[in-house]
Amino acid sequence: MAKFVKGSELNHEIDSLFENALNELIIVSPFIKLHNRQKDALRDKIKDPKFKLTLVFGKNESDKRRSLGQDDFEFFKQFTNVQVYYEPRLHAKYYANDDKGILSSMNLYEYSQNNNIEFGIVTSIASGLDRLKEKVIGIELDNDAWQYFNSVIERSELVFHNEPLYESNMLGLSKKYIRSEVRVDL
């Protein structure tokens, strides 16, 4: 089910999406400057190797730091399981966690949240029987958006990747987190 939101309700939905991300968070925005509320919501996930953060930013080919500032980039680099991508043609804005997605006009930029007229469409990420029901009645906005933005991620340039490393235990039936290793840092 899709829901139209604007103003402070949009800010609340984005903050809620960050807070309630259990296993995965996708941030797609040309310009990113996190509000302190969003950083606070993510801090307890920094050292969780099961939590995957995927970030795509864009624009400003001559100086990428104008699209993603150094402070925010350093904040994201702390995550145990994170991939940061750059797409110079990016204009779309999409935020998603395990349960919901938000298609929005708003950059993830503190100024935009406080000063601009912005809107968003909040959708639920369907699974199981709900997904089957949506296929039957033809409502697939959330899944279409999820798939589209995953294809955008795949086509973007990977500029940073921190990957969790595990040790197999009990004949490979379980695994124990050891550390994270930076695979890409451009």
Model-assigned labels for residue ranges:
Residues I102-L186:
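Signature of lipid phosphatidyltransferase scaffolds
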Residues A2-H12, L34, K52-E134:
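HKD-type phospholipase D/PLD-like phosphodiesterase module
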Residues L17-K77, I178-L186:
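Primarily the HKD phosphodiesterase
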